[in-house]
């Protein structure tokens, strides 16, 4: 007997229904805003992540040397891949480029609630515009996807920040600070003890007094006070940009979900401007449902022309936890609309009935094992078929089939020549 690998999951039909409903909701929201689907490889050259993603990702790579001697890795995230794709056809692609993709990723990390070594995300990216409306639009897609699943503003919140506010505040201190290290420390602020948090800020170059002052600034909600403290155009412009994004979110009807949270930093090194994370409002999920932000320099770092970009990536493990905690996890297990039951030598007639129902868009199961009448009825009940159509020799001799509603037990006969007839989804009451 072989055991499943730690951090990997099997999804049986009962689990796949809710997962598929959640994925479809996010993808449908993306498509409604004009995003187009792309497909991407499961593996890339390891050096791409070493060069572009930062230490946090590199330490968790599933990487190896392939049979051709190349150092390769299973993709731990999508942004570098789609950046590579944009660079490859940058001149031919119409701007702005709006793409989405749902697929698995892999990171070697310790499994816990909502975190697995193989995990699934729907990535949404916009390339080719720095307009704040693009930032607001990816938030709007995410919000529309969540609310279409039954969530409300009482269930989730978008915590929004700006990398240049953080970097500008750090630069205002009389210290030589490793800005990226300090921002990575801010990103894990809620995950480590305060003493360790201050130690890490000190290791990045701040004194302990400066670290305390910096943290106090992040806890405040007065953006004008931050501009005054820093006294630089960098922070002033970043605050103005953040406000413009929030104004655009208001226009799109999603400002109600957004809270300014300067301790939201995102740990990946390529983020440059506005960043955001979605959290469960109750705190029960315990980690971000998803995150994203602006990465205006990444295309150029891949060798392309300067191209501003922004993206977000809802994670489906944490999203399903959020839906479950809110009591709105979709109950969408796949079940047949019809089971066509055969009695006697009726293969041809049963196949014709099943084909006619399928042509009308129905999900139809049939017997492929030669089971008895009772065994077929038990199977139809077990797989949750709504309606059973019985195609038996005796009924056919009279020119009929029998239709049975599995929930109520009600049944009637219908002329086979008129079934399904004008009915796309024929029911017992249509022929009673």
From Swiss-Prot:
Belongs to the class-II aminoacyl-tRNA synthetase family. The gene is hisS. It catalyses: tRNA(His) + L-histidine + ATP = L-histidyl-tRNA(His) + AMP + diphosphate + H(+). One of its GO terms (biological process) is histidyl-tRNA aminoacylation. InterPro entries: aa-tRNA-synth_II, aa-tRNA-synth_II/BPL/LPL, Anticodon-bd, Anticodon-bd_dom_sf, His-tRNA-ligase, HisRS-like_core, HisRS/HisZ, HisRS_anticodon. Its EC number is 6.1.1.21. One of its GO terms (molecular function) is histidine-tRNA ligase activity. This is Histidine--tRNA ligase. It holds the Pfam family tRNA-synt_His. It is found in: Cytoplasm. Keywords: Aminoacyl-tRNA synthetase, ATP-binding, Cytoplasm, Ligase, Nucleotide-binding, Protein biosynthesis. Its main location: cytoplasm. The keyword Lipoprotein does not apply. GO terms for cellular component: cytoplasm.
């Amino acid at each position: 007997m072989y055991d499943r690998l730690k951090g990997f999951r099997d999804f049986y039909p009962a689990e796949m229904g809710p997962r598929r409903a959640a994925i479809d909701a996010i993808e449908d929201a993306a498509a409604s805003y004009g995003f187009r689907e792309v497909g991407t490889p499961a593996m890339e050259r390891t050096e791409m992540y070493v060069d572009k993603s930062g230490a946090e990702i590199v330490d968790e790579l599933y990487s190896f040397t392939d049979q051709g001697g190349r150092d390769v890795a299973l993709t731990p995230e999508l942004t570098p891949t789609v950046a590579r794709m944009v660079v490859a056809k940058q001149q031919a692609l119409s701007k702005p480029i709006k793409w989405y993709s749902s697929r698995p990723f892999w990171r070697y990390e310790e499994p816990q609630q909502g975190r697995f070594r193989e995990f699934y995300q729907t990535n949404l990216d916009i390339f080719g515009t720095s307009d704040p409306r693009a930032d607001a639009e990816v938030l709007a897609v995410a919000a529309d996807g969540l609310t279409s699943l039954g969530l409300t503003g009482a269930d989730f919140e978008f915590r929004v920040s700006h990398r240049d506010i953080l970097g500008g505040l750090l630069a205002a201190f009389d210290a030589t600070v490793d800005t990226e290290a300090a921002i990575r420390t801010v990103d894990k602020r809620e995950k480590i003890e305060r003493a360790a948090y201050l130690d890490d800020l000190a290791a990045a170059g701040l004194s302990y007094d400066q670290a305390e002052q910096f943290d106090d600034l992040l806890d405040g909600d007065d953006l004008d006070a931050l501009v005054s403290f820093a006294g630089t155009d960098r922070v002033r412009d970043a605050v103005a940009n953040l406000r413009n994004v929030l104004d655009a979110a208001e226009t799109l009807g999603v400002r109600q979900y957004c809270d300014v949270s300067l301790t939201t930093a995102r740990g990946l090194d390529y983020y440059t401007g506005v960043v955001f994370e979605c959290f469960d409002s109750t705190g029960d999920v315990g980690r971000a449902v998803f995150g994203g932000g602006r990465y205006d320099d990444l295309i150029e770092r891949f060798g392309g022309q300067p191209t501003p970009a922004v993206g977000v990536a809802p994670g489906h493990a944490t999203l399903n936890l959020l839906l479950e905690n809110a009591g709105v996890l979709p109950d969408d297990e796949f079940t047949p609309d019809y089971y066509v039951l055969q009695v006697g030598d009726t293969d041809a007639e049963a196949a014709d009935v099943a084909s006619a129902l399928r042509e009308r868009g129905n999900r139809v199961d049939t017997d492929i094992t030669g089971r008895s009448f009772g065994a077929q009825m038990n199977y139809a009940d077990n797989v949750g078929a709504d309606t059973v159509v019985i195609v038996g020799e005796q009924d056919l001799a009279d020119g009929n089939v029998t239709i049975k509603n599995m929930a109520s037990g009600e049944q009637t006969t219908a002329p086979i020549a008129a079934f399904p007839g004008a009915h796309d989804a024929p029911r017992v009451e249509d022929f009673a």
